[in-house]
C-alpha cells in the first residue's frame, strides 16, 4: 500500500471529550492496518494507543507520538493538479507516514509508537502515554512528536524540525548532521507553536517535533494544501532521525 492510499484511509473522523475517545473511526482503521504487522498493541488507554514490536526488547526506548484527534466537521482527501493534495490533514498526514514506516518495518525494535488524543486541547493523551509507560518501568530516552506546520512551505521543505526541548548537545548535533548529510531541504524552528513536545518536556523527556509542512488553515473544514511528493521524504525522515536518536541515547 502506498502512503497516499494510507493517507486517504486514515483521513476519517476521530474525536474525544478530553477524557476518552468518542468517535473512533480512525482508531478502527489504524488497528485494522496493523493487525497483521510486526507490531502489537501493548497499551490501550482512554486517550491513546501504544504499539511496539514483539516483544519490547529494551526498557529504554525512543517514543514517536502522533495525535489522531481532529476538530473538523467533515473530513476529506483529494488530489489536485501539479502534485498537490487538499484535505483535512491535521494530523492524518503524519499518521499515514508513520503507519507506512510501521508496515514496512523501517523503525528500530526499541522504537515505541503512540497514537494520542486530546492534542488539540490539553494533550491528555500524551500525558496518559507517559503514565502508562512509567507503570511498565519503560524509560522514554527520547521523544519525537509528529505534527503538521505552516513553517517551511514557502521554502518547499518536505519536513521541519521544531521545538527541540531538553535535547543534549551530542544528540542534537548528530540529528542536524544527519539532516545536512541527507541533503533534503528543511527548516529548523527552535521556539515554535505549542504541541505535545511541551508536555513531554515538562516530564524532563528530551524531545523535538518533526513536522510536515502545509499551506492554509490546518483546522479549516475547507482543508489545507500539501505536496504529495513530500510523503515518502517525510516518512524517511521519521525512520532516519529516530535511528540517529536511538544510536545516540540507547
Feature locations, PLM:
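A non-catalytic alpha/beta surface segment that caps or lines the substrate-entry region
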Residues: 8-58
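Generic non-transmembrane alpha-helical segments
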Residues: 9, 32-33, 174-183, 236-248
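Short secondary-structure junctions
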Residues: 36-44, 79, 181-189
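Acidic/histidine-rich catalytic neighborhood of metal-dependent amide-processing enzymes
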Residues: 71-73, 85-170, 176, 184-199
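Functional cleft and adjacent loop/helix regions within the main domain
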Residues: 189-232
Amino acid at each position: 500500500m502506498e502512503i497516499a492510499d494510507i493517507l486517504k484511509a486514515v483521513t476519517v473522523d476521530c474525536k474525544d471529550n478530553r477524557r476518552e475517545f468518542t468517535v473512533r473511526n480512525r482508531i478502527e482503521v489504524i488497528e485494522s492496518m496493523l493487525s497483521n504487522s510486526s507490531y502489537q498493541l501493548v497499551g490501550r488507554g482512554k486517550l491513546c494507543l501504544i504499539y511496539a514490536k514483539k516483544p519490547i526488547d529494551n526498557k529504554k526506548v525512543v517514543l514517536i507520538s502522533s495525535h489522531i484527534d481532529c476538530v473538523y466537521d467533515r473530513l476529506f482527501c483529494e488530489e489536485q493538479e501539479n502534485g498537490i493534495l487538499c484535505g483535512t490533514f491535521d494530523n492524518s498526514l503524519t499518521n499515514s507516514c508513520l503507519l507506512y514506516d510501521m508496515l514496512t518495518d523501517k523503525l528500530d525494535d526499541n522504537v515505541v509508537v503512540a497514537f494520542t488524543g486530546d492534542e488539540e486541547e490539553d494533550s491528555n493523551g500524551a500525558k496518559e502515554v507517559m503514565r502508562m509507560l512509567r507503570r511498565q518501568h519503560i524509560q522514554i530516552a527520547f521523544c519525537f512528536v509528529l505534527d503538521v506546520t505552516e513553517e517551511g512551505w514557502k521554502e518547499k521543505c518536505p519536513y521541519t524540525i521544531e521545538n527541540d526541548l531538553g535535547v543534549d548537545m551530542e544528540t542534537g548535533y548528530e540529528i542536524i548532521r544527519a539532516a545536512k548529510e541527507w541533503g533534503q531541504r528543511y527548516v529548523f524552528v527552535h521556539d515554535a507553536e505549542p504541541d505535545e513536545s511541551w508536555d513531554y518536556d515538562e516530564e524532563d523527556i528530551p524531545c523535538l517535533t518533526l513536522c510536515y509542512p502545509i499551506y492554509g488553515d490546518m483546522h479549516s473544514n475547507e482543508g489545507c494544501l500539501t505536496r504529495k511528493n513530500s510523503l515518502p521524504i517525510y516518512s524517511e525522515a521519521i525512520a532516519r532521525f529516530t535511528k540517529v536518536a536511538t544510536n545516540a541515547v540507547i
